[in-house]
């Protein structure tokens, strides 16, 4: 594997994503500038300037015309992906933690953090309704939680959303019936859910948690199907689009490393078999924990973002492409 | 290089000026596998540079939307940058090998290491005897075996101490024999005489190894006799011959052979 190493961020990465065709890579970090890159040669096209704090999440619409960023400066911004202009700004009283587009690209969901008297919230806004996209606009879906919502994701068209919480709880809401969650799973994880990613065909969810496991979930009822155990907190997990493989990335936080008796390390990305729940391969590269990762739609590339501020685009070689899992 | 080689046997070179001119012309060569090597010359601040670029042209079918996105204009921090990757943001990192923990035969390769790590991480109990992490020392199932081992170790230590002290029977006997053979007894010793004076007196005869003045256990006063050990028996004999009956202070010394105690 001859990886590309992209240095466009000054601080730790928080999210990398591919667009639908996989030719662009979107990344954001704890500095203020989300970036967009060509996946093929690692060329940076531009940065979206305007945020005033750490950018926690970025998402791109299906047609790669818009992208949305959630930031610690209490705003969610929607950008023109091609020109880098800010189209809309959504304000709130507390930092924004995650954001995502719906399947059609018309709805934007985001979660806000719990802070002093403000509860953690999950909101959805419609980009087509101009009254929702102005300063002081109201979301058409609004839900409050006592515990921090860490990640949110549209899991079925424009109707169902799944929210992961700091306590390990997972909840699924139907936007057409906003009162109560339609599915709840509180036993899948014991600690914070760090990442939720959908499989490319939309039939599975994978959740990564700080309890050193990642779980494969049924997208329709949040039932746990498989569990993948690691030796380190899992910060991100992704599913291969064309093979039964799972990739986990994680590692101890920098501030925790000196407090553990075990030597530091284990910053590799690990590849597991989806069905047999066993690790069969690993590759290293980052000097520090892996904070986020995404699998390319072609199945031959994985992008990882690390605590060291680098994005690595790893293209698999023949060893992996020719590998068959013997059981 | 190929051009230079081709030029060497060329008969039409008639002057050095023409040859130099040909060498300075930019040209392109094509390799067998489709790679192209482009050679160009540039002059910066009066210094001529030869720039060799090697690349490969690949035609790839992509969806139209992907082809359209290839024409995006740079914005933000990259405003005004030319097309192509920039060295400030993009570079090819070192080769990374993917490690397979299960080879094609399905064997687990890294299992032992991982198990150790896991045990270390999770267990707080530690056994001194078998170094395991799943129980305390008092509950060790192999305690009896390890205790026997410990007793054997203790015996070894004791033996070591004996050897270190030099308490072997052979060594002791040899030392005692030598000491008794070369020792003479001094009686009628004045009380005022101390060890230094005695050493001075007997040192004239030969090398003195040991001097022992007998003292009362309670009062600490000399008892009036002493033992002097010489290095060789000849010295002891000479001391007896010369120092017997000499007058020290107000007493007449009596120097004679030591009688064996056993």
Curated annotation (Swiss-Prot), chain A:
Q: Does the keyword Protein biosynthesis apply?
A: yes
GO molecular-function term, one example from the UniProt record: RNA binding
InterPro entries to which the protein is assigned, alphabetical: eIF3i, WD40/YVTN_repeat-like_dom_sf, WD40_repeat_dom_sf, WD40_rpt
Any Pfam family hit: EIF3I
One GO cellular component term: eukaryotic translation initiation factor 3 complex, eIF3m
UniProt WD repeat ranges = 8-49, 51-89, 188-227, 229-268, 285-324
Q: Where's it found, cell-wise? A: Cytoplasm
Lineage, top-rank taxon, reads Eukaryota
A GO BP annotation = formation of cytoplasmic translation initiation complex
Keywords, A to Z? Cytoplasm, Initiation factor, Protein biosynthesis, Repeat, WD repeat
Which family does the similarity line name? Belongs to the eIF-3 subunit I family.
Q: What does this protein do?
A: Component of the eukaryotic translation initiation factor 3 (eIF-3) complex, which is involved in protein synthesis of a specialized repertoire of mRNAs and, together with other initiation factors, stimulates binding of mRNA and methionyl-tRNAi to the 40S ribosome. The eIF-3 complex specifically targets and initiates translation of a subset of mRNAs involved in cell proliferation.
Q: How does it assemble?
A: Component of the eukaryotic translation initiation factor 3 (eIF-3) complex.
Q: What is this protein called?
A: Eukaryotic translation initiation factor 3 subunit I
- Please give the organism: Caenorhabditis elegans
Q: Tell me the classification of the organism that encodes this protein.
A: Eukaryota, Metazoa, Ecdysozoa, Nematoda, Chromadorea
Q: Which gene encodes it?
A: eif-3.I
From Swiss-Prot, chain B:
Summarize the record's disruption phenotype note. Abnormal morphology (dumpy phenotype), slow growth, sterile and in severe cases embryonic lethal.
Q: Where in the cell is it found?
A: Cytoplasm
In its keyword annotation, does this UniProt entry include Cell cycle?
A: no
Matching entries from Pfam families are given as: eIF3g, RRM_1
Its GO biological process terms? formation of cytoplasmic translation initiation complex; positive regulation of translation
Under Gene Ontology molecular function, one entry of this record is: translation initiation factor activity
Q: Which SUPFAM superfamilies match?
A: RNA-binding domain, RBD (SSF54928)
* Stretches assigned to the RRM domain: 182-260
Keywords linked to the UniProt accession: Cytoplasm, Initiation factor, Protein biosynthesis, RNA-binding
Among InterPro entries, the record links this protein to: eIF3_g (IPR017334), eIF3g_N (IPR024675), eIF3G_RRM (IPR034240), Nucleotide-bd_a/b_plait_sf (IPR012677), RBD_domain_sf (IPR035979), RRM_dom (IPR000504)
CDD domains assigned to the protein according to its UniProt record, in alphabetical order? eIF3G, RRM_eIF3G_like
Q: What is its main location?
A: cytoplasm
What GO cellular-component annotations does this UniProt entry give? cytoplasm; eukaryotic 43S preinitiation complex; eukaryotic 48S preinitiation complex; eukaryotic translation initiation factor 3 complex
What is the annotated quaternary arrangement, including any partners?
Component of the eukaryotic translation initiation factor 3 (eIF-3) complex.
**Cross-referenced HAMAP family:** eIF3g
Record's function text:
RNA-binding component of the eukaryotic translation initiation factor 3 (eIF-3) complex, which is involved in protein synthesis of a specialized repertoire of mRNAs and, together with other initiation factors, stimulates binding of mRNA and methionyl-tRNAi to the 40S ribosome. The eIF-3 complex specifically targets and initiates translation of a subset of mRNAs involved in cell proliferation. This subunit can bind 18S rRNA.
- Specify the protein name: Eukaryotic translation initiation factor 3 subunit G
